[in-house]
């Protein structure tokens, strides 16, 4: 029997990342926030390029050699597409975290410059 709250989204990597971010983001240091804000866009770009290349290659494989047996089982194509969908969802979540991290880092820096505490 599941004791998971009905208010939580379906569990997947993107939703898990966003939930953890919402819980932890306000407690991170400027360095940690900058790490997310500066590192995530590069990773998102790299992974998006990788997904584009993989899906293009799969399209070519399927269209050029229908008799190769590649993705010939009933659920092969849907499994690949679901995997790609989950990867793209994670990239979207990571982009959201990076954007928010940049905003929070800037907010903390401005508060520090004014001699106060961010969020106070």
Q: Where are the regions that the model predicts?
A:
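Sequence/structural signature of long amphipathic alpha-helices
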Residues: 1-120
């Amino acid at each position: 029997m599941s004791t998971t709250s009905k208010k939580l989204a379906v569990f997947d990597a993107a939703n898990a990342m966003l939930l953890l971010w919402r819980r932890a983001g306000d407690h991170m240091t400027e360095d940690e926030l900058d790490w997310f804000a500066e590192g995530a866009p590069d990773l998102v770009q790299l992974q998006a390029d990788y997904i584009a290349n993989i899906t293009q290659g799969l399209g070519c494989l399927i269209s050029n050699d229908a008799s190769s047996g590649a993705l010939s089982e009933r659920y092969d194509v849907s499994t690949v597409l679901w995997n790609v969908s989950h990867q793209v969802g994670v990239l979207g979540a990571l982009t959201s975290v990076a954007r928010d991290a940049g905003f929070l880092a800037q907010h903390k820096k401005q508060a520090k410059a004014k001699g106060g505490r961010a969020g106070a």
